[in-house]
Amino acid sequence: ELARAKVALRMRRDGEQYIQTLKSRGQSVAGLSERNEWDWYLEKNKLDLKKLDDKCWPAALKDLDKKQLKPIFSTDFVRQRAEIAWGRGKARVVVEAALDLGKVVAGDNQEEICELELELRQGDAAALLELAAELAADLPLMPCDISKAERGYRLFDPNSYEVDPPAQKLLAETPLDGAFAAIAWYLLGSSQRLAEQYRFNGHWRLLEDWLQHLQDLRTLLGSLGQAVPRASSRELREALDALLADWAPRIERGRDDETLRQQAPQLFRGELDETRWGLFSLNASRWLLA
């Protein structure tokens, strides 16, 4: 029930301190996430249900008997933190970088945790994406808004992970540039979640859907010259063309070749081990926010 309500309840140990955390999903677009979060510092490894009051507990779960709450997965990871600060024009930018390495375990299933979280402490959000893009140029970083809780739920129930982010409603009075941005964000966010889920389970249909979303995004970028000058999206289109040039023929051949379909997950992992996909995703986000 917590998963359906987009809520995660966690107990964490940090040294000798236990921390009870409640998280609820806020806005999430194309790998960039805003989450509501409450922390309580406790003396022992036991939920304090009194902390889960109306100030933080979702109304959708008001009838849930909190005494029945039981853990369904656990995470074991080490976090390393660093603060990065620099000047951007006349403004100061401060970002907290957290590297998490470990695993999430649900029953007999487990998945590796290897996450770099960048949190803007001070400055313009555009600076955060600039830093992420610089890192992604040298490291195989893949923007993804899946939380550790979602990873645990997915191990417990593989069908719990939603590959399509919520679509924004377009109205007749929506300006052309607003409609363009909404569609582009949806296609980009969906492609990222499809890539993550295909990496996880290797289901062929997800790879086909990933390609289709990228092809739709490429069509969108090339079709609205009046709303978006083509020169501004040239580098983005070239990067997307390179991705499509490699993957469209592979997927087309794989539709009629079982051997190629079986080889595709390993090829895709190879793609994710390079910088191309992550850098394209981040640069697309930067372009849409510009």
Label for each model-derived stretch:
Residues 1-290:
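Function-determining surface determinants
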